[in-house]
Amino acid sequence: MKLIDFYIDKGADVSSENSLCLKKAAEYGHLIVVKYLVDLGVDIIAKEPERIYIKENYGKIVDNYALIMAAKNGHLDVVSYLVEKGANPKSSKDYGMRLAAKYGHYEVVKFLVENGCNANCDRAIIWCCEENHLEILKYLVSKGANIFPDTRNDEDSAIARACAFGRTEIVEYLVGLGVNITDHNYNLAACAISSKNFDLVYYLVDHGANIQTYDHLAIIWASELGFIDMVKYLITKGENIHCRNNYSIKRAISRKKVDMIRYILSIGTFDKQDVSELIKHAEKYRYSEIVNELKIFCLELTNKP
């Protein structure tokens, strides 16, 4: 504090740059400094005058920046003090609460909801699902959060985001509450495959998830990511390795998944025209090793009786 007084004595303006000193003190949780600056009359509601980079808000302008950043970093004492002094907890569409949910600050979320923030906030719900904050999600649901939004066609639904991040506990919780995974039009199994959580894939399929939705996305993603055992599993569950005009092997070619390409060639039923198309596809990416293997495979087809 002596250093701040020193600079003030030398003519420093603690309110300059739109209350930047206060914003930084709040962001880093320095409550004593925050109180001192507020007592000096620094504006606690100051809006950023230009587009700022907060990645979760896509660079949009926000007000009550000090409160929002304190909430993001979990500084409950700073948040509660700023609210007491007149900061708006609901500013920028409950943005402080959303960030507190994203970063797992349960007590901050609870405080902000109790002070007027809307628990039924899609982005807070989705961020909880992505970041595996089950207790915060349960709290938001207890306060009226809707986990059944009209987004069955949308990869941005709560259940889809939980699957995409491999959050098994969150998925089980949502299913336990009645979220229907059998008629979700986005491919939840594909989401789980992308997260490499194969146990979650098995769970979803066992509970009725359709592996063929979204134009056979599950087997296509498994192929392009090189997950041979997962491709085998999906085939046992009724998937067709030749779906979408052999798109699975084409994606494997595009990603240079040589072992996957060899596996699909070994189990599939290809004619010379099919392989000629695959050769053209590989040539487009200038994958000489794959092109040569496909040419050999095509020659073997020609020599078959």
Swiss-Prot record:
SUPFAM superfamilies: Ankyrin repeat
SMART domains: ANK (SM00248)
ANK repeat intervals: 1-16, 17-46, 62-91, 93-121, 123-149, 154-183, 184-213, 215-243, 245-274
Key words of the record: ANK repeat, Repeat
InterPro entries xref list: Ankyrin_rpt, Ankyrin_rpt-contain_sf
A Pfam family matched in the record: Ank_2
Gene3D superfamilies: Ankyrin repeat-containing domain
Protein name per its UniProtKB record: Putative ankyrin repeat protein R777
Biological source species: Acanthamoeba polyphaga mimivirus (APMV)
